[in-house]
Regions:
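Charge-rich, intrinsically disordered N-terminal extensions
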Residues: 26-62
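Residues in the recognition helix of alpha-helical DNA-binding motifs
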Residues: 159, 300-303, 318
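Intrinsically disordered, low-complexity terminal tails and inter-domain linkers enriched
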Residues: 2-34
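A short, conserved structural fragment
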Residues: 305-317
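Peripheral (non-transmembrane) domains and long loops of multi-pass membrane proteins
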Residues: 289-290, 316-318
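Short amphipathic alpha-helical interaction segments
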Residues: 291-305
Length: 319
């Protein structure tokens, strides 16, 4: 190797083997963007201080119960649609004890058109568990949280972080997409959370501001690093983003589009809409005739009854 180095100082030869000088100088590739290093993480946190939305459950003094309700409502539902129902719920049931005293059907009726009404049943069951097993206080421990009805890993982490300021790996789709792009150079995250993603995300959480990073990374993903039309020119960490530096390649994992029209999910939603505003119940025939396909309507009504969302007598359906 040393001889090669010494020979390089002599007359250069071209690739054709002649003694003519080589005119093309060697250039090093540009340095790889640093991704989500500690300085970039701090930049995201600083951006949030002046750009974060004033959502009601983020305000000082918000109870852990209010944070928990906001997280359950926000699952697969845009934040803008959650603010109104969340405000109404907190006025009506400001504590778990308040909701636990109600019938489950009352919670389902108040859920309105947020979608996925099973969440209302689970939230009611969660309130009962908190009232009876935790003296009406939302637990701050992650393991105790995931033992509650309807509380999974994400919601538990969000409550630990947003309600109690604890260190937790909060990974919603917005955070996962931000990490995939800025750190991994990939256009989007996989459809399902992987162990590698969780391990990578855990290493990014700063010790001095874990809760701030959780909410800031989520907000940047929701407002700037969006799924379909990311606003890279407005991004505070554009200079560190590996996906942007690579030219925003179309290299995201393939995602299967979820249909809506004509599905059982749409049918169940129509049936729930018919029954929700009639506390005394609706005739079974009226309920079934709200959907054009009788067999599908009967199947979906049976599913809603089996799941506890509706109650059916011989000729009436009610919450």
């Amino acid at each position: 190797v040393a001889d090669d180095v010494h020979r390089a100082s002599g007359p250069a030869t071209s690739a054709l083997g002649t003694d003519s000088p080589v005119t093309n100088s060697l250039t090093c590739p540009p340095p790889r963007p640093r991704g989500l290093d500690p300085e970039t993480v701090a930049t995201v946190c600083a951006w949030y201080r002046t750009n974060g939305r004033d959502l009601p459950w983020r305000r000082p003094g918000t109870s852990p119960w209010a944070v928990l309700v906001s997280e359950v409502m926000s699952q697969q539902t845009p934040v803008a649609r959650v603010i109104g129902p969340w405000t109404e719920w907190m006025q009506r049931w400001p504590t778990p004890d308040d909701l636990a005293e109600e019938e489950p059907g009352t919670a389902v009726a108040a859920w309105g058109r947020l979608g996925y009404p099973r969440r209302a049943l689970r939230l009611h069951a969660c309130a009962v568990a908190i009232a009876t097993q935790h003296d009406g206080q939302v637990p701050s421990d992650r393991d105790e949280l995931v033992s509650l009805p309807g509380i999974g890993d994400y919601t538990a982490a969000a409550v630990v972080s947003f309600a109690f300021g604890g260190r937790a790996v909060v990974l919603d789709t917005n955070v996962r997409r931000l990490i995939a792009r800025a750190e991994c150079g990939i256009g989007n995250c996989p459809s399902s959370l992987t162990r590698a993603e969780r391990e990578l995300a855990s290493g990014l959480v700063p010790d001095d501001a874990p809760a701030r990073w959780a909410v800031a990374s989520m907000e940047l993903g929701a407002l700037v690093c969006t799924a379909r039309s990311p606003h890279c020119t407005e991004c505070p960490i554009a200079g560190s983003c590996r996906w942007l530096a690579a030219g925003r390649p179309d290299n995201a994992p393939t995602r299967r589009a979820q249909p809506w029209k004509g599905t059982d999910r749409q049918c169940r939603g129509v049936i729930m809409d018919v029954v929700r505003n009639c506390p005394d119940g609706v005739p079974v025939e009226t309920t079934l005739s709200a959907w054009p396909h009788r067999d599908q309507a009967e199947h979906c009504l049976d599913w809603l009854v089996a799941d506890g969302l509706l109650h059916r007598t011989d000729d009436t359906v009610r919450l």
